[in-house]
A protein has these predicted regions:
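Conserved functional hotspots at enzyme active or ligand-binding sites that engage polyanionic ligands
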Residues: 1-111
Length: 111
């Protein structure tokens, strides 16, 4: 399922396990494709299995999105991580799901 040859994210819509202070956690890469390869820090949104029913959450399913378990992307937890924090690629979201990511991010930020 993962691509172990890469050392960090290169494309928006990729899901990775990344080192965080709380241990390795799944994240969604939000950085634009031309930028993700060239900068030292990458903009990501955290994934969690805890659903709160918020406007700022987008549900992902194991069946449709090839994630290890059903979860949500939490756009209230957007931050940057150094490229060196990325451990293992999980999958890449489909273009249709990536469109939903952008719509949910827009709805959650209001801009």
């Amino acid at each position: 399922m993962g691509d172990r040859r890469r050392t960090g994210p290169t494309r928006r819509g990729e899901l990775w396990f990344a080192a965080t202070p709380g241990g390795d956690r799944p994240v969604l890469v939000l950085a634009r494709d031309p930028v993700a390869d060239r900068i030292g820090a990458v903009v990501v949104a955290a994934l969690t299995r805890t659903r709160r029913g918020l406007l700022s959450e987008l549900e992902l399913t194991a069946a449709e999105d090839r994630v290890p378990s059903d979860c949500v992307v939490n756009f209230d937890n957007v931050h940057t991580l150094p490229r060196t924090a990325f451990r293992r690629k999980i999958t890449r979201l489909s273009p249709a799901r990536l469109h939903q990511v952008c719509r949910t991010l827009w709805a959650s930020t209001g801009c």
